[in-house]
Amino acid sequence: NDLEFGWFLPTRGDTLDYAIPQQIPPSPEMFKRVVKAAEDNGFEYILLPVAAACWDAWLTSAVLTGATEKIKMLVAARPGYINPVLLAKMIATFDQMTKGRISINLIAGQNDVENIAEGVGLSKNDRYEMMMEEVEICKGLWSGTGKFDYDGKFYKLKQAHIGPEIYQKPFPKFYLGGGSPEAADFSAKHAHVH
């Protein structure tokens, strides 16, 4: 129930005026300045977005953890973009490498045009169903109970397992934002923070 404060990393560029989105162009130097300023001012996490115009959130966050000491990376994840077994392994590896400096921001996708352009042209309901399966698979693989089977609408696994084990027990925090009834239901079941 602790209050947390986070900041947003503008990986498509920053601005002093919202109407000019890339007034300050994106660069590794700008990202490091922003994340270090957030850390130095006591923010617990920095949100790295995922969108076509943004720099890759996973690679950017991996580099930024090396430039900081304690701030957590809140990496956005959308359904259908990364195989859930690989996603679970990526998160567990990141979690171990940084001693728990990762959280996941679940996004069902608010931009249908971008989803279709990137090959994930599912309905909103299907995106939420797929995201639910991906979260259940990640949690199942992180449970440490051995081989994991899953029989869902989108994913079917037989004897799946990953290494390394997750650092944060039982698993990292999941965040979810959204005002729809689907978002509220999903958040109540699977997210730590809404």
Residue positions per predicted region:
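N-terminal beta1-alpha1-beta2 module of alpha/beta enzyme domains
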Residues: 1-68, 169-172
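A structural motif corresponding to the C-terminal end of an alpha-helix
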Residues: 37-43, 68, 137-145, 169, ...
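Alpha-helix-loop-beta-strand connector modules within alpha/beta enzyme cores
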Residues: 57-76, 130-137
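Short, acidic/polar
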Residues: 23-38, 87-90, 178-186
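Active-site beta-loop-alpha junctions enriched in small/polar residues
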Residues: 10-12, 51, 76-80, 107-111, ...
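Hydrophobic faces of well-ordered beta-strands that scaffold small-molecule active sites
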Residues: 3-7, 46-48, 72-77, 102-106, ...
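Acidic (Asp/Glu)-rich catalytic clusters
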Residues: 36-40, 62-70, 91, 95-102, ...
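Flexible, glycine-rich active-site loops centered on histidine and acidic residues
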Residues: 2-24, 80-149
